[in-house]
A protein has these predicted regions:
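A ubiquitous, low-specificity "background" feature that marks scattered single residues
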Residues: 23-24, 62, 69, 181, ...
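N-terminal secretory signal peptides that target proteins for export/translocation
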Residues: 1-9
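N-terminal, post-signal peptide beta-strand-biased segments of exported outer-membrane/organellar beta-barrel
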Residues: 27-131, 135-137
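Short linear sequence motifs
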Residues: 15-17, 43, 55, 179
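Outer-membrane beta-barrel porins/channels
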Residues: 30-47, 107-317
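Bacterial N-terminal signal peptides
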Residues: 10-25
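Short secondary-structure junctions and interdomain/linker hinges
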Residues: 18, 53, 57, 71-74, ...
Length: 317
């Protein structure tokens, strides 16, 4: 159907066009819409090469097996400010500038992690378990284009305000090997924007809808995935701190069955459904501390990351 085909193309374009956000952090820029890499200030300052180190509460995100390195009850929270502009030039030379719906995306992506070493808290009957729960925005986008831009009939605004709730446990088998297991509960929250995936465009005319109408397609759902991880420490110094760490993490894909509406100038035109897949992610890293004493330490870490974007190659509305 022409209406469905038009919105299928528009919604897929909205996810692709939001790639060029600028992150105000010492982190790498990646054209991996809509994935947000930096999920803690310390890890972002190291270019997100943190899978092997994973020794603060953000291990809950980067490598949950690393939570066994923590003692007592620890928390970490923060935010990442996303701003800047997106420049687009069409094959005909037409240009357009997009932004984040203002100078800085608001509300910005944020993260909260709470981690408890159960033995340190007096629950020795549970063995070498560490439990944690976190909340962050590992996927998301927010992009606005002018209503008179060259592709206004495809997109003028898009937002994907996803929230990930992460109940997680880790187990220390011995001083060399730890494992982690967790859930990723993805949902759309009213704390972040309108609480649904949203894309707007200007209608070119036809199908009984006046030309120039502001069109909106939206949808929401809650879904879940899982993650498994390990941390291997073959060498330690005399203080028991790692000199070599090897970390591996697998995050499963998660599938949304979105339900929402087509709107024209704020009035509902039809219901809408779509399937949207968050990709599986494989991460691995090796960290080496050539120097690690009570006075100073120096770490080298090399991480690899594979994201299976082919799983969301198509988006049918």
């Amino acid at each position: 159907m022409p209406l469905a085909q038009r919105f299928r193309r528009a919604l897929l374009l909205c996810l692709l066009c939001s790639a060029a956000g600028f992150v105000f952090a010492a982190a790498s820029a990646n054209a991996q819409t809509p994935r947000l890499q930096g999920q803690s200030a310390a890890a972002a300052a190291m270019g997100n090469a943190f899978v092997a180190q994973a020794d603060d509460p953000s291990a809950l995100h980067y490598n949950p097996a690393g939570m066994t390195q923590l003692h007592g009850f620890q928390t970490l929270f923060g935010t990442t400010l996303i701003g800047g502009t997106t420049q687009f030039t069409s094959p005909t030379g037409a240009q357009v500038t997009g932004d984040r719906n203002g100078s800085v995306a608001w509300p910005p992506p944020g993260h909260v992690y709470l981690v408890a070493n159960l033995k340190d808290l007096g629950l020795s009957a549970l063995g070498n378990f560490t439990a944690g729960i976190g909340m962050n925005n590992p996927f998301g986008s927010l992009t606005r284009y002018p209503n008179d831009g060259p592709f206004r009939t495809a997109i003028t605004f898009t937002t994907l305000p996803l929230l990930d709730i992460k109940p997680t446990i880790a187990y220390k088998l011995n001083d060399q090997l730890s494992f982690g297991l967790g859930a990723d509960i993805y949902t759309f929250s009213g704390l972040f924007g309108e609480g649904h995936l949203e894309q707007k465009s200007i209608w070119p005319g036809g199908l009984g809808i006046p030309a120039g109408s502001l069109m909106e397609i939206n949808g929401s759902d809650t879904t879940a995935g899982f993650n498994v991880s390990l941390l291997y420490t073959p060498f330690r110094n005399s203080d028991g701190k790692p000199l070599v760490n090897i970390g591996m993490v697998y995050r499963s894909q998660a599938t949304f069955h979105l339900t929402g509406n087509f709107l024209a100038n704020g009035a509902s035109v039809a219901g809408a459904t779509a399937t949207f897949v968050l990709p599986q992610v494989f991460s691995g890293g090796i960290g080496i501390w050539p120097v690690r004493t009570s006075e100073r330490e120096w770490k080298l870490e090399f991480d690899v990351d594979y994201t299976g974007w082919k799983s969301n190659r198509n988006l049918d509305v």
